[in-house]
A protein has these predicted regions:
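Basic, flexible Lys/Arg- and Gly-enriched helix-loop patches that mediate nucleic-acid binding at interfaces
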Residues: 1-169
Length: 169
């Protein structure tokens, strides 16, 4: 949920997403992060190898976001976002795809395969747009679907088999 930090131990004593998870033998490991202003799908595991494989850039795993922006966005800017832009700190950010939602103005579905810090926000900022709302709706083949804010569930066997990385039980 927005306003909850994705860390298991916060020195500033802020609310963390880990407080919502059940107790397990071992520890929960987050697969990726969301910033404080972003909501949506987070995956957790107790297997460090799985977490590392799913987050490593060489795994080429896609993440899909629903984004509402403020500012003018046209085909030229869309092309720039797909080709890649300087997003500061000597980094290039780019989207693998971007499509407009037909029913809502300034709402887009963005897919990318890199997980740079605040990359979606930084790419849109590079073309003069501000992200108003950002929600991760998919990570690899796992979709958020109708899961409510703050809820969790375990992956099904079918979902585990759909993961892009080899997985052994």
């Amino acid at each position: 949920p927005c306003g909850e930090i994705v860390t298991s131990n916060d020195n500033a004593n802020r609310k963390t997403v880990f407080e919502r998870l059940p107790d397990i033998d071992g520890k929960w490991i987050n697969i990726g992060r969301l910033d404080l202003e972003t909501s949506g799908l987070l995956l957790f595991t107790n297997n460090g190898d799985i977490a590392n494989k799913m987050m490593h850039p060489s795994s080429n795993i896609s993440r899909k976001y629903e984004v509402i922006i403020k500012g003018s966005f046209n085909d030229i800017k869309k092309e720039q976002c797909i080709k890649g832009l300087d997003i500061g700190m000597s980094e290039t950010g780019k989207f693998d795809s971007i499509s407009a939602c037909k029913l809502t103005a300034n709402k887009y579905i963005v897919t990318l395969k890199t997980g740079k810090n605040r990359e979606v926000r930084r790419v849109f900022r590079s073309v003069g747009c501000t992200v108003i709302k950002l929600k991760r709706i998919q990570y690899d083949n796992i979709k958020l679907n109708n899961l409510l804010v703050g809820e969790y569930r375990y992956l099904t066997e079918k979902e585990i088999k759909l993961l892009s990385i080899p997985f052994e039980n």
